[in-house]
């Protein structure tokens, strides 16, 4: 998946209703300026999740090192985030690198059923789009 395709998907899902597309372009630009030019399906899914939520976007530098393609797992489970934001972020992390937790309790938190049950309608749509992005042909 290239950056243009990801931006088109975001445009189709969000249009001009929010700033998702602008935030997504900023994340992709920041990533490429940091020397990481790879926008693959895994990157695309988590970038979309982060761009789709204003709070996650505002905190992305503490969550993800775009230049090194790394996630700070400790920040994902920060109590600063709402249960819905944590659920979206956990889904993004799982789609990015398959992470399912280090303990049985964490594994439950990363379970797709548990994630989807914590999301409202808007965030469920974001989650479904992220899954489509990750597993698209």
Regions found by a protein language model. Give the residues of each.
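Extended, charge-biased low-complexity segments
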Residues: 1-81, 97-137
């Amino acid at each position: 998946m290239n950056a243009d395709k990801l931006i088109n998907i975001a445009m189709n899902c969000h249009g001009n209703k929010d700033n998702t597309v602008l935030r997504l372009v900023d994340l992709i630009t920041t990533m490429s300026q940091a020397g990481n030019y790879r926008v693959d399906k895994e990157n695309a899914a988590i970038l979309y999740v982060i761009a789709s939520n204003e709070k996650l976007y505002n905190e992305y530098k503490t969550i993800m090192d775009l230049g090194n393609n790394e996630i700070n797992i400790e920040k994902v489970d920060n109590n600063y985030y709402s249960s819905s934001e944590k659920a979206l972020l956990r889904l993004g992390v799982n789609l990015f690198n398959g992470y399912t937790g280090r303990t049985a309790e964490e594994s439950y938190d990363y379970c797709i059923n548990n994630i989807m049950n914590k999301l409202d309608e808007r965030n469920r749509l974001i989650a479904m789009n992220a899954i489509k992005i990750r597993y698209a042909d």
